[in-house]
């Protein structure tokens, strides 16, 4: 376990070592942090690529890491612990130079199973939000105590720099679905936050954390939203506990398509959440800088190289070829194997994606949605069938030519569909770049759309660090390139307002 914590002296030394890399002060803590941080959503200790990307980022001068107990079911924190411990052991970085943030609230995977076991024992976590099958939420002090112990073990740390309540508004969502009045729900919501803050102050006293805060997706929401989290109300709670409280950091989503953090006047004095945070000298982390959610569609703010889009006729023919190949498996391959009727039916069900593609290929909405379906739904199904067939003892020689042929046909169909969505994404990226460039001359200096999205945020007064999911070393390099370019931090409210209602 690494002792110590991030210090003003240590982070200043990091900033000096990596000049002209750009850093800023994190609230009143005196800590200097890079204007882009390593966001650990969807990274895992078991993936070498993620390990190398985090290592590259830390050595390049990125000195803020944001993770959570539920990311990769604990694997994200384990990755941070392993990489940081390795670099610290070899004296490549020091504990004092890097700010580590983690979060608490979700019960998924292992935590969900822990919760079910406690229920069976008659000792359920208190104030548990039963949100959905496989998903619960909790910010009760008892749960926070349990989770902080586990997080510190995975991170291999004695002390965590910042510990955030992770989307506590899940309670408000649950309350709305179960008929609790909005007035009663909000009263209970802020009461739960107060109890959590009281406990977090004791964790500061114990030396297990230095500061605490909240990460909420609804900080930038309209005040009329039933799930809105009022920073002003949260600040009042912290102030009521002690004039020397340790509530020092918030996190919220913001990007070129979702500028509410700047433009939504949702505090009682007409300020935005970012303005209020700036006045109270709170640190502000921004998440989802490159992933916008518009009308339930995921839009990736990164440039995609366009290719010639295949025609509808070409795609239809390729999908017909795929359906024919699926039919060959049913008619010629499976009858030669010693499989039960039930197993044959399962194999056919798994591999039958041609019909779905024929009906739906043009309705997936965006390149990001199509890529997600292709990579995490369709392709794994096919791989599962191929692996199953290759393991059969009754395998005949005719199976191997079919496997090779089917994979080629599948790749051709996937490629043709991708070409359509890639063309759409490239056109959309060009329109977005033009709109953003006209909104602010400083933003126009960025080389790529992803760098433009980062530049817009890091140049906005009140934003401390932008969290970027740098899962590959190439993503790290893209961020480092942008952070090496000078840009003034200033009030850019008018620039952000020009982006409101930006069309896809």
Report the location of each language-model feature.
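N-terminal binding-site loop/beta-alpha segment at the start of enzyme catalytic domains
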Residues: 1-120, 126-130, 134, 142-145, ...
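Short, exposed beta-strand "edge-strand" segments with a Pro/Gly-rich flavor and a Y/T-containing core
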Residues: 1, 45, 90, 132-139, ...
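Short, acidic/polar
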Residues: 45-58, 137-154, 227-239, 449-456
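Outer-envelope exported proteins of Gram-negative bacteria
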Residues: 99-101, 160-165, 211-217
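Alpha-helical hinge/cap motifs
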Residues: 61, 156-157, 210-213
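Beta/alpha (TIM)-barrel catalytic core signal, keyed to glycine-rich beta->alpha loops juxtaposed to Asp/Glu
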Residues: 4-13, 18, 73, 168-504
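Short beta-to-alpha linker loops that shape the active-site pocket of alpha/beta-hydrolase fold enzymes
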Residues: 68, 163, 168
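Fungal eukaryote-biased detector of long internal structured cores
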Residues: 137, 143-145, 150-153, 157-158, ...
